[in-house]
C-alpha cells in the first residue's frame, strides 16, 4: 500500500454508478453503488467500491477505498515495459506496449485505468466478459505481472550491467 494521495495530485475516474434495489417487506429500498479508479498519473493507481443510500456518499466511500488500494506499476517512456495478459473470472485483458504517439487505444474501463496510471501510449483489448468491475480487476491482475528491469535481473541472478551487456 502506497500513501501518495497526501502529497500529489489525484486523477479520479468514475467507472460506474448504479442504483441498486433491495426488496423488503414494505417495498423497495434503493441505494447507490459506485466503482472508481484513482491514480496520480505517475505510476500509482488503485480501484475502489462503495455503497450508500446517497450517490455522493457512495462516491466518497469508493474514493476512500481506492486510495487505500493504491499500487505502483512500472512505466517506461509512457507505456508498459512488455505485453501482459490479466484474467479475473471470465474477463480477460490483453495489454501491449505502444510506440510514442500511438495514444491510449483501450475500451472504457481499461482506458480510465490507463489515464489514471499515467500511460500515454498503449494497445489494449478486452476479451470475454465486458462487466466493467471484472475488466478493471483483470487489468490490475495484469499489472501484477509487469516486471521492470531490476526484477528481471534479480530473477536471473544477474546485475543490470550484465543483463544489458
From Swiss-Prot:
Keywords: Ribonucleoprotein, Ribosomal protein, RNA-binding, rRNA-binding
GO terms, molecular function: rRNA binding; structural constituent of ribosome
Cellular component, GO, one term: small ribosomal subunit
Classification via InterPro entries: Ribosomal_Su5_D2-typ_SF, Ribosomal_uS5, Ribosomal_uS5_bac-type, Ribosomal_uS5_C, Ribosomal_uS5_N, Ribosomal_uS5_N_CS, Ribsml_uS5_D2-typ_fold_subgr
BP-aspect Gene Ontology terms: translation
Pfam annotation, one family: Ribosomal_S5_C
Range of residues in the leader sequence: none
Domain named S5 DRBM: residues: 10-73
PANTHER family per the UniProt record, alphabetical: MITOCHONDRIAL RIBOSOMAL PROTEIN S5
Role noted for this protein: With S4 and S12 plays an important role in translational accuracy. Located at the back of the 30S subunit body where it stabilizes the conformation of the head with respect to the body.
Family, per entry: Belongs to the universal ribosomal protein uS5 family.
Record's comment describing the protein's domains: The N-terminal domain interacts with the head of the 30S subunit; the C-terminal domain interacts with the body and contacts protein S4. The interaction surface between S4 and S5 is involved in control of translational fidelity.
UniProt name for this protein: Small ribosomal subunit protein uS5
Protein's organism: Borreliella burgdorferi (strain ATCC 35210 / DSM 4680 / CIP 102532 / B31)
Gene behind this protein: rpsE
